[in-house]
Amino acid sequence: MSSVSRREFSAQALGSLMTFSLLETLFECEAFGKEVQPITARWLNELNDLGRDLRDEAMSQVAWQEKVEELFGEVNLAELLKFVDLEQLAAEAKLVEKGARSLRCSFPKIEGLPTNLVFGKQIFAVKNRRSVVPHGHNNMATAFLVLDGTFAGKHYDRVEDEEDHIIIKPTIDRGFAQGECSTVSDYKDNVHWFKATAEPGFLFNIH
């Protein structure tokens, strides 16, 4: 595993705030109606506070995972996602027979919201019974959010790195539906594997 300082990790992890980036994107696209924008704005601010705590080393990686998942539980994300045009997204996505189609997304600045976040973001479009390739991460906090469809999700702790393989231990094995998320860090649930159990399946990912 490559070496990285805590400060360098925190800077990367700050850019990995999945929920902040997704909702920021939806705000840009005016995907939310006026009746839900105040709720979403509060949510964004709370998520940004979590990112600031992580950046300032006031929060551990695992605590960040727990808080992000807890915050998801406080808002009916499935209801908010009804304001997103997933039908259009499904019509435009060209699903592949193997693996997942990666759809790049971008958005301009939003007045009044934090800027200068550095992160990678994408939406995975997956056919039924196809998977995002199982993988693990080094020096990264990342997360997946189910936008549409259902998935069989598996996570593993990364116990030890050997010269030509890694030793892992199962931690999560369950179904994931719209609005549910999972998180990853160096210390918890590092390896993950998502297989679509309905079509189309869409996952929003920040890495």
Can you name each region flagged by the protein language model?
Residues 1-17:
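N-terminal secretory signal peptides and thylakoid transit peptides that target proteins
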